[in-house]
Amino acid sequence: MMNQPLIELKNIVRRYGHGDTETTVLKSINLKIYAGEMVAIVGASGSGKSTLMNLLGVLDQADDGEYLFRGRQISTLSSDELADLRCYHFGFVFQRYHLLPHLTAVENVEIPAIYSAMEKEKRIERAQKLLCRLGLENQLKHKPSQLSGGQQQRVSIARALMNGGEIILADEPTGALDSQSSQEVLSVLKTLNHQGHTVVLITHDMQIASHADRIITMKDGEIIADSGVTQNLMKSSAQEVTPQLSSMHYLATLRRYHAAFLMAMHMMFAHKIRTLLTMLGIIIGIAAVVCVIALGEGAKNKVLAEFSALGNNTIDIYPGKNWGDPDAIKIQTLNQVDLALLRQQPYLKGATPQISVDLPLRFLNRTVNASVYGVSDAFFQLRKHRLLSGRWFNAHDMATHQAVSVIDKKSQQVIFGTESAVGKTVFIGQIPILIVGVVETPPQNIEGQRATIWLPYNTVVSRLYNQSYFQQITVQVKEHIAPDLAEKAIIDLLTIQHGRKDFFTFSSRKFLQSLQRTTQTLTMMISSIAFISLVVGGIGVMNIMLVSVIERTREIGIRVAVGAKEKDILHQFLIESASVSLLGGMLGVLLSLLLGGLFSAFTDSIKMQFTFSSFLIAFVCSSMIGMIFGYFPARNAARLKPVVALSQE
């Protein structure tokens, strides 16, 4: 009594086309194939034998009828289960070999084991053993172009055996070979059958078919003759030749991803120019984004550095309703009483008045226009001026109305050239003024046309400019006090003191916050423009990946035939696009650093400030672009039907 068939077909029908163009290629095929048989399916071109082979190897599906594998209905299996069936049970030997041209013989044979998650060392060892067993021990590292037709077909057979090859489906395996190579391949297939493999041989040549124990003849999509089931079936040894697979799912998944990454790298470096051109848009886009962020950060830091010269947590008090008030010049209520009152407030760290007047300054026979500022000794610390030489004027100088002054570095160069100003006496009007210190030129004074000189404000009032009120009072809020609350308290205090609000305030903290918001907005606007180039680069990646899918359609078909699941193909192309984009991102960052160095070499007004966050944004953007724009080509690749993909040249 016969055992359960390994393969059983019941009333299988396969049609192509629709409506008037519909063609029935297979008509009510009924067939049983038992384990250990060597079956030849023979027929002329167009008889349906290749279509039948595709159905047997689950590369295609029937329109009607039932296909049972070991009694299990194939139509109930999911896409992944069908892939597992191809991976662990079927091995294909194609007429045109279908070897990947960029891989060596060993690497071609390894492919099925990648999808069965065999460990790398084991799959290399097994691939080498299979090739040696087939007489290719001297061609292990050869690529298909370096092999003869017979050698390529033996590599194809070794690949079919990689995961055990319980069933060998050979489609015209000798069609492209000379007579000697044909005999060698047939001998190998017969040997495999004697070892227990089920061999199904597809051919149009009855002489080739005669090597099989059972011959099935097809014509016009129907089986017209069957010599009958072989009585002395070879005991299957598939269990003996099937490699042991990992039982740990996460390790298997990791191996698949690792193999996909290596394949992606291989494809990138196999097409260096195309990869570089693909990455060019990403490189330019990432470099633009990083440079814009760095430039914005540098500009912000420069502005903040300049703004720090105005002091931290300072509040300026001016006469008038607001900036540009034409009546402000008539208001004379900011005076010594206000200054004394403000200095008594517990929430303030210090206060300094300011009187300014433009007067000629003379040294020897040289006269320059100067902005003369009357301030207190607390002014320099409050405004964070940096002393370069000499000293500040102090409380004693203030109390005794000393004619001492401090000038800035630019004024020193204008008046004294290369000489030091400290200890020199200049004349403002007819009053001799001793210079006791030199400070760094404040950023707001660098482009000014006048010399700048600071004197004790009471000296200015008593000796130079008789004025009883101040043009400005600046206070500094203590660190632990909220500036907004301090500003409100000052407004309330002076409004009560004056009997009305005839002044306005300017908070450095508010201005700083407004400045930061403006800088961030500008950076975002410019970055969004730069981001457009990233999108263009992403579209370039998608275009190239779409072309790559079309170019590699046959490769996709081969991978699916040897056991790749849809997700394996999807992941491989996604990894390729993400790798291209990430590498482009890295090169873009390097380019931005190079541009930053060149920028610094040509100008020192603004320095590009590169930050970790900008690099992080670059890598996130490049990887996301690779994933997003690579998804659609990858999905198209994963959805290709294997029988259609294999038919592409």
Curated annotation (Swiss-Prot):
Its main location: membrane. One of its GO terms (molecular function) is transmembrane transporter activity. ATP binds at G43, A44, S45, G46, S47, G48, K49, S50. The chain crosses the membrane at residues 276-296, 529-549, 582-602, 612-632. Residues 7-245 form the ABC transporter domain. GO terms for biological process: response to antibiotic. Keywords: Antibiotic resistance, ATP-binding, Cell inner membrane, Cell membrane, Membrane, Nucleotide-binding, Translocase, Transmembrane, Transmembrane helix, Transport. The keyword Oxidoreductase does not apply. Disulfide bonds: none annotated. The keyword Transmembrane applies. GO terms for cellular component: plasma membrane. Its EC number is 7.6.2.-. SMART domains: AAA (SM00382). Part of the tripartite efflux system MacAB-TolC. MacB is a non-canonical ABC transporter that contains transmembrane domains (TMD), which form a pore in the inner membrane, and an ATP-binding domain (NBD), which is responsible for energy generation. Confers resistance against macrolides. This is Macrolide export ATP-binding/permease protein MacB. It comes from Pasteurella multocida (strain Pm70).
